[in-house]
Amino acid sequence: GCKGFGKACKYGADECCKNLVCSKKHKWCKYTL
């Protein structure tokens, strides 16, 4: 699953984590196993 942290991510948590650029750039987008 995926957890998105912070309001600064303009994408939903799942979409943000699927986007590696976003998830690496924004530390609040994190994967959870």
Curated annotation (Swiss-Prot):
Q: Does the keyword Disulfide bond apply?
A: yes
* Taxonomy, superkingdom: Eukaryota
List the record's Gene Ontology CC terms alphabetically.
extracellular region
The molecular function terms of the Gene Ontology recorded here are:
ion channel inhibitor activity; sodium channel regulator activity; toxin activity
- Please report any disulfide bonds recorded for this protein chain, giving both cysteine positions: 2-17, 9-22, 16-29
Localization (cell): Secreted
Q: What Pfam families would the database entry show? A: Toxin_12
Give the protein family.
Belongs to the neurotoxin 10 (Hwtx-1) family.
What exactly does this protein do? Voltage-gated sodium channel Nav1.7/SCN9A inhibitor.
Kindly provide the name given to this protein in its UniProt entry.
Mu-theraphotoxin-Osp1a
In which organism is this protein found?
A: Orphnaecus sp. (strain Sibaliw/Philippines) (Tarantula spider)
